[in-house]
Amino acid sequence: MPAPGVVVPFDISLHSHLTPYLAAIHASCITHDHTIATFLLPLSHEKLLSWWKERIAETNDGRRLMLLLVSELDPSGRIKGPELIGVVMLWMPYSETGSFRGYVEKLLIHKHHRGKGGARALMSALEAEARNRGRTLLLLDTESGNQAEAVFSRLGYTELGKVPGYGMSPAGGLKDGTFFYKTLEL
């Protein structure tokens, strides 16, 4: 099986031009899969762009790590928008009592590139980076019953439980949320 792509850390000086492509993958996951992912239909392109710009700003101050999955990478490190096929983020809020915790957010894979190991590649890179930063307890949530729930189980995340009616679905109605954690060894 060929490699799912190349995982690269987001660098604001090299990758800020990808903001519309990040927003497009996010929008596709909401409209195509009805994923609970921050926004409801009808989507506002401006809201999505603004949301991603805020996340990008957090990468610049060290509170957030963003990893990109790309189909190819040229030697300069510059990525063309269509080469972007996935993203995942690690949020690392300041906490003296929880400096070892990190929160996995927005594991999003373009619909045409799923089932090829991209989620595994992104999560493996995220876990390595989390370890390097001393974040040994990872927490996340996802919509119950979706593909991501099965992916996180396969990747060794332990289910904490389900919360009924946790989020509003873009398809309408409330959906349950499943919470996971994983302890990383240093």
Enumerate the predicted regions with their spans.
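Conserved GNAT acetyl-CoA-binding A-motif
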Residues: 123, 130-143
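Eukaryotic N-terminal targeting leaders
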Residues: 1-6
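Conserved catalytic-core motifs of GNAT/GCN5-like acyltransferases
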Residues: 137-143, 153, 158-176
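Active-site beta-loop-alpha junctions enriched in small/polar residues
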Residues: 107, 143-145
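Acetyl-CoA-dependent GNAT
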Residues: 9-106, 110-112, 123-125, 129, ...
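Short hydrophobic/aromatic beta-strand or adjacent loop that forms the aromatic wall/cage
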Residues: 64, 175-179
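Conserved G/P- and acidic residue-centered "switch" motifs that form tight phosphate/ATP-binding loops
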Residues: 117-119
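Helix-turn-helix
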Residues: 148
